[in-house]
């Protein structure tokens, strides 16, 4: 019987796919976990209890009865300035109108536009909000959907002043039903190129011919009609110059091309995606032309109709490949990046030249395809996107070696945490020793995948967030992470807006303290904590003045605690923390121990500011002597020994849990292992 001492110094691989449990040969095994539930893996190596969720708003009554949570709710961040940013919550109320709620600095903005309502009515029409795409420039948010004419939302002079309007676009033209005719007349141009007046020998032109084309068959010349003067005279702009001026082109030697109509219309649909890039507003795809790219005139964001193909003119190009390539997303980065259902593209810019009609080229980079409805996010020079089938998280990153983009699978070790992803958001690192936190909600079971990312140290550490109910949507306002949850409250289905709070340890919680603003409450002067109707009939955790009280059940929107609080009370739903190490596989001279019985004799976790932690069901004593009865929980930093741990097993694993809603951080763990024959 062999005894060895093992030390797991970090957990920076996070929770790995069950399919990898047999891969004791890979380097990542030593830093991985079998389960990481409701914890955040730190880029320094440890893990900590995830933040609690602060209750913000019940939006259940605003969601129209016929709409599902999948198409009727949407979170969109909006950054107005370097000091002012917002979270906008869109809730579909009727087939015509959507209500927009505004949050700033963790508080709801009320009395929008002095209307007495705490929401702005937005006439978005009967669209699926989860397919609505957005971008912004300064004080204006642009919203697009293939079944909705583009909209704008503008913040006015204060937090509560907002304007919703339909954008008036100058649409490009496309021949959806091209037809040609040969009018019985000669035509004579008065110039060779540029803006040209054309005179016909008989009345052949009508006002409907504006934006249609004259094409010379025998010779040179192609021009777009821009103005109808009379039946015998039109003004055109040449695409190809005429051979000579003031010389009649014979009847039958030219044709009139018709069938060109607005690309963006109620008949042909509207843009699918949008982004700003190098002074232009780009639309990626439309309902009828899903694989086309449209760029506005520089500095004139809503003008998409080309004129003379000058460098600042509008752009219109179609991705022509051997597959459909409907555009699902775009991002302005090193280049203009274009994500489609079948592949990833970019617009190269040689020598950093700006994009113009004459040099516009779309290059294919990779062929993975991205999932529609999930907007890619920027992270450390790359772009993270969900692959088309929703089974992989990929990083679209330019390689200086290959001089091309790559789409590496960064969820290879943890693809089981992606279960029909619905939304994705990134909270960028907030300090020099912090990492980015990528959050992905799953439709299948309402869980949330959480990926701690620090690419400079090759850290991609996933864990899983679960709550009493489902996570429906997630978005980030600078550092504040908002979610929409679905919970069953008193036998009714509710949808709440909530926000992660590092200082709280329960879900859908409110706190009572001096100076609180709604939905938090002022500190009660007695033992009754009220205004808890959003948790009616639920069993809740209660923390009073850092003491954890016995569980309470909310009745008539209130609970009764043991004594009046002196500083604060937190009341919220409990959530389970569970972290399980992989089976211990020491490297012995006799070989592997996969088939042997094993026992962990003792464990010594390294803790940081921890108030409660248990290992294999044994609560770790954190108090130090002399101990005072009735004192608040100890906040411990250091190493604690837990022994003896009883029982042989086939795996020999450590399971970290918590018995109370308190803070916990584990930096590493040493354990002594005994192996049988």
Locate predicted features:
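A short beta-strand element within beta-rich, extracytoplasmic domains
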Residues: 597-610
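Surface-exposed interaction regions enriched in Ser/Thr/Asp/Glu
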Residues: 244-265, 554-592, 657-676
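Aromatic/His-enriched, Gly/Pro-containing loop or helix-boundary segments
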Residues: 107-139, 245-261, 312-326, 364-368
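Beta-strand-rich solenoidal segments
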Residues: 105-181, 222-223, 440, 447-497, ...
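Beta-sheet-dominated scaffold domains
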Residues: 131-134, 280, 321-541
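Beta-sandwich interaction modules
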Residues: 123-133, 562, 628-653, 657-661, ...
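Autoprocessing Asn-cyclization modules and mimics
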Residues: 110-111, 155, 162-253, 406-417, ...
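N-terminal beta-propeller domains
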Residues: 1-112, 152-156, 161-193, 253-331, ...
């Amino acid at each position: 019987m062999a005894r060895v001492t093992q030390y797991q110094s970090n957990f920076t691989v996070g929770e790995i796919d069950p399919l990898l449990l047999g891969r004791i040969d890979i380097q990542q095994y030593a830093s991985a976990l079998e389960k990481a539930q409701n914890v955040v893996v730190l880029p320094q190596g440890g893990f900590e209890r995830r933040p609690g969720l602060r209750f913000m708003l019940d939006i259940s009554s605003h969601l129209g009865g016929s709409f599902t949570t999948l198409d009727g709710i949407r979170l969109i961040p909006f950054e107005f300035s370097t000091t002012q940013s917002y979270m906008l919550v869109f809730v579909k109320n009727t087939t015509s109108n959507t209500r927009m709620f505004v949050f700033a600095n963790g508080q709801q903005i009320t009395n929008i536009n002095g209307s007495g309502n705490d929401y702005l009515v937005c006439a978005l029409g009967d669209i699926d909000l989860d397919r609505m795409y957005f971008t912004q420039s300064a004080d204006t948010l642009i919203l697009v959907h293939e079944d909705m004419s583009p909209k704008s939302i503008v913040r006015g002079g204060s937090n509560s002043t907002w304007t919703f309007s339909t954008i008036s676009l100058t649409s490009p033209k496309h021949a959806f039903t091209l037809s040609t005719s040969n009018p019985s007349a000669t035509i004579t141009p008065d110039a060779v190129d540029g803006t040209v007046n054309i005179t016909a020998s008989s009345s052949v032109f009508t006002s409907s011919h504006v934006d249609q084309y004259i094409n010379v068959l025998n010779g040179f010349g192609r021009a777009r009609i821009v103005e109808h003067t009379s039946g015998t005279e039109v003004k055109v702009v040449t695409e190809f110059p005429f051979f000579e001026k003031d010389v009649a082109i014979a009847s039958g030697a030219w044709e009139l091309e018709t069938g060109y109509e607005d690309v963006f219309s109620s008949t042909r649909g509207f843009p699918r995606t949008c982004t700003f890039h190098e002074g232009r507003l780009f639309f990626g795809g439309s309902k009828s032309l899903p694989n086309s790219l449209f760029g506005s005139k520089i500095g004139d964001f809503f003008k998409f109709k080309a004129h003379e193909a000058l460098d600042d003119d509008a752009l219109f190009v179609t991705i022509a490949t051997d597959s459909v390539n409907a555009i699902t997303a775009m991002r302005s980065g090193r280049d203009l990046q274009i994500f489609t259902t079948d592949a990833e593209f970019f617009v190269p810019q040689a020598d950093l030249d700006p994009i113009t009609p004459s040099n516009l080229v779309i290059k294919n980079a990779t062929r993975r395809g991205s999932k529609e409805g999930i907007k890619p996010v920027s992270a450390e020079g790359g772009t993270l996107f969900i692959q088309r089938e929703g089974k992989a998280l990929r990083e679209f990153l330019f390689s200086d070696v290959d001089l091309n983009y790559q789409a590496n699978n960064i969820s290879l070790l943890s693809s089981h945490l992606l279960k029909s992803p619905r939304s994705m958001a990134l909270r960028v690192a907030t300090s020099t020793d912090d990492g980015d936190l990528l959050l992905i909600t799953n439709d299948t079971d309402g869980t949330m995948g959480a990926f701690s990312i620090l690419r400079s140290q090759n850290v991609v550490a996933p864990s899983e967030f679960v709550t009493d109910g489902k996570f429906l949507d997630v978005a980030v306002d600078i550092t504040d992470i908002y979610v929409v949850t679905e919970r069953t409250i008193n036998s009714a289905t509710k949808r709440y807006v909530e926000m992660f709070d590092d200082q709280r340890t329960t879900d859908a919680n409110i706190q009572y303290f001096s100076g609180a603003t709604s939905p938090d409450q002022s500190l009660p002067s007695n033992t009754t904590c009220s205004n808890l109707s959003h948790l009616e009939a639920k069993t809740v955790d209660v923390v009073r003045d850092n003491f954890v009280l016995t569980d309470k059940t909310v009745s008539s929107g209130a609970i009764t605690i043991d004594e009046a609080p002196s500083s604060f009370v937190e009341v919220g739903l409990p959530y389970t923390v569970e972290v399980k190490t992989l089976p211990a596989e020491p490297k012995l001279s006799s070989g592997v121990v996969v088939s042997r019985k094993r026992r962990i004799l003792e464990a010594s976790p390294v803790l940081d500011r921890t108030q409660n932690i248990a290992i294999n069901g044994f609560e770790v004593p954190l108090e130090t002597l002399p101990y005072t009865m009735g004192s608040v929980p100890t906040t411990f930093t250091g190493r604690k020994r837990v022994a003896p741990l009883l029982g042989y097993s086939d795996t020999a694993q450590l399971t970290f849990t918590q018995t109370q809603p308190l803070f916990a951080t584990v930096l590493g763990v040493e354990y002594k292992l005994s192996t049988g024959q």
